[in-house]
Amino acid sequence: MIPAVILFAGNGTAAAGGLFGPPQPVSKEAGGLHTGIGYGYLEDQYRNDTDHTIRKNQVYSEVGYGVDHWGVYGRIGVSDLKILDAFRSTQASTSSSKNDLKDDWKFFGTLGGQGFYPLNRTFGIGAFLQGSYYFQDFTDGTSGTNNGARFTTELKVKNLWDVNFGIGIQATVPNEIKLYVGPYLYCSRTRIAPSVNMPGLPFSSGEITIHNKTNIGGFSGIDVPLARGFHLVAEGQYSERFSVGTAVTYSY
């Protein structure tokens, strides 16, 4: 991972579909395809009446096309999901065998586009739009007692999606290394449905929608050219919580 000194506060979950990347497309200036693989650790706060911390680990593959000033890309990947204290009881009469919701790898897809305008040979500015959707539900269950009676219940996290729009400033330094930083806007929603409405548990009043707590964040990263068309990208994002990711791309 590139040293974190270049990663300033960026978003907590806006990277739900992976890195935003540098404002300038990674494809060759004359135009062409690129492919890549990436990993991201994502953490953010969602809320309805109360706050809920969500964590994800993602791996994905990417294919895109671009020229010097614009590019489009798509990603397909898998992600786990953890909601802290999703089963933690808030009443003495209810106890649960576990606190956190956890589920393993589910498929998601991402589409994005970007435009770039060079101000001079060193600096440039760009904008991007990126959206992700999770094709499968996350589920987990717990058991416990309520007023001495045994119960089992399951939570289902459905239709998780996010949309991000941001503006980035890029500086090209020696060895064609690109440093970039900027703000972004972010919107994410998901529905959570319990199989049983159990008093004392956080999600106990039927199906609800939760959304990201903060709609604005910042991101910062570095793009390092490697040998023979390969690039290494590392990025940090922050709004309510910190997220980080890295990717390797190849330009044809």
Q: Where are the model-predicted features located?
A:
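Residues that define the transmembrane beta-barrel architecture of outer-membrane proteins
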Residues: 29-33, 53-59, 68, 103-109, ...
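Extracellular loop and loop/strand-boundary signature of outer-membrane beta-barrel proteins
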Residues: 45-51, 91-102, 149-156, 203-208, ...
